[in-house]
């Protein structure tokens, strides 16, 4: 094992400068340009006026590793890393980040060092180096860099490891694109069969959403509660999912006692994002199937429980995900947009014949089966979702992939 500080030296501090009033400033990368895949999003790079001299070494070069020094949250620790592959000597990085540059590229392949740090972050390895002050998560960067160790293997093996991981990433991206196309196919099929639910050009019979079911706001928790551990569906679990059928994988919360029945999710419940600082998330919905696993939902969510057999869950869920219905759900909060039961009560849902809804449900099942086939094809091709690369010890565990 080799100390990271021997490989890169101390992390260089970033620059922020002043507002760019001329439009001729220097592009500066921020943590908002970080992605969770370890690559840089160049779409929203700001420019800043940097007047400080002697910062030539801070201009980024291919193979540089940028580490997050400040940010994160209770759920996602600080310490993310991204790999720089942009133009040399063009970009700087801001003061919430640091630069790690391999000193001897002939001994240490920069991408290998990056993958080691990336995998360590995914394992939660930076959490013990966090310093929390007034809600802000700071990385004790010098301590982390001086103590973190990278597995030593020869250069040929380093390159081989990275080639395999890069290939895996390409396949993952290809699979994501295929899944997105399948999702678009579901949307197109829905419109073909039922039309736009707000315009209702097919003139289906309609019913108010709350005439067909009931709503319940989620639970508010207290950090000092203890005694009962229970899985909890929160806003961060929605992502772009339509269905969550393994609630055992959700995070848990501590409560003083088991929630009452009305706060426990049941199969076929639909849960909405009720409130969030990101307006784009408000109104998102998922159908949940907890089975026998006791599962509650957070106070930032609303649970809808269908009580009318006039609609099926696959059909209703797709109605609620259409752009026109999402616009109807848009609240009017100032900083935090809100969805409430009154807004949901004003939603008018077309009710096509149940036979047609069942046809759509069968179509969705076939699409879901195709998604599973993509999953197993990737396994057959030698790229399972759980990938271990071994040297003397396990150095990388991409369990999220």
Predicted regions and their residues:
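Sequence-specific dsDNA recognition surfaces
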Residues: 4-18, 33-65, 72, 207-222, ...
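A short glycine-rich beta-alpha junction/loop motif
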Residues: 2, 90-98, 126, 130-156, ...
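Short amphipathic alpha-helical coupling segments at ligand-binding clamshell hinges
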Residues: 109-113, 154, 164, 312-319, ...
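A short beta-sheet element
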Residues: 30, 56-118, 234, 261-321, ...
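Short coil/turn segments at secondary-structure boundaries
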Residues: 17-24, 128-130, 202-205, 222-229, ...
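Short amphipathic beta-strand starts and helix->beta connectors
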Residues: 84-85, 129-134, 287-289, 329-333
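Non-catalytic DNA-recognition/assembly elements of restriction-modification systems
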Residues: 1-15, 149-163, 174-219, 346-359, ...
């Amino acid at each position: 094992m080799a100390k990271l500080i021997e490989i890169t030296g101390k992390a260089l501090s970033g620059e922020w400068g002043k507002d760019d009033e001329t439009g001729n400033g220097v592009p500066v990368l921020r943590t908002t340009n970080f992605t969770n895949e370890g690559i840089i999003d160049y779409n929203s790079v700001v420019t800043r006026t940097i007047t400080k001299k002697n910062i030539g070494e801070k201009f980024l070069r291919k193979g540089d590793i940028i580490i997050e020094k400040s940010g994160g949250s209770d759920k996602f620790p600080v310490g993310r890393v991204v790999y720089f592959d942009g133009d040399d000597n063009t970009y700087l990085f801001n003061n919430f980040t640091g630069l790690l540059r391999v000193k001897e590229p002939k001994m240490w392949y920069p991408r290998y060092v990056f993958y080691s740090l990336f995998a360590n972050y995914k394992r939660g390895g930076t959490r013990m180096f966090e310093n929390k002050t007034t809600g802000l998560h700071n990385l004790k960067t010098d301590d982390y860099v001086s103590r973190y160790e990278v597995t030593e293997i020869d250069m040929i093996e380093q390159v081989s490891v990275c080639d395999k991981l890069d290939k895996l990433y390409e396949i993952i991206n290809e699979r994501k694109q295929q899944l997105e196309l399948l999702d678009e196919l579901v949307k197109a099929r829905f419109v073909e069969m039922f039309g736009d639910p707000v315009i209702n050009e097919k003139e289906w019979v309609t019913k108010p959403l709350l005439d067909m079911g009931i709503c319940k706001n989620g639970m508010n928790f207290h950090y000092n509660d203890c005694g009962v551990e229970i899985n909890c569906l929160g806003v961060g679990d929605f992502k772009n999912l339509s269905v969550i059928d393994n609630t055992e994988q959700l995070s848990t919360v501590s409560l003083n006692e088991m929630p009452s029945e009305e706060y426990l999710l049941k199969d076929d419940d639909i849960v909405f994002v009720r409130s969030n600082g990101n307006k784009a998330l408000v109104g998102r919905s998922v159908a949940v199937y907890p089975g026998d696993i006791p599962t509650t939902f957070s106070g930032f969510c609303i649970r809808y429980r269908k009580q009318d057999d006039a609609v099926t869950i696959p059909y209703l869920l797709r109605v609620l995900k259409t752009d026109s219905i999402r616009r109807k759900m848009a609240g009017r909060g100032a900083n935090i947009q809100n969805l409430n039961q009154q807004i949901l009560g004003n939603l008018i849902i077309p009710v096509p014949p149940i036979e047609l809804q069942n046809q759509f449900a069968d179509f969705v099942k076939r699409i879901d089966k195709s998604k599973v086939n993509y999953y197993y094809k990737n396994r057959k091709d030698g790229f399972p979702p759980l990938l271990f690369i071994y040297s003397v010890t396990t150095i990388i565990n991409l369990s999220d992939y």
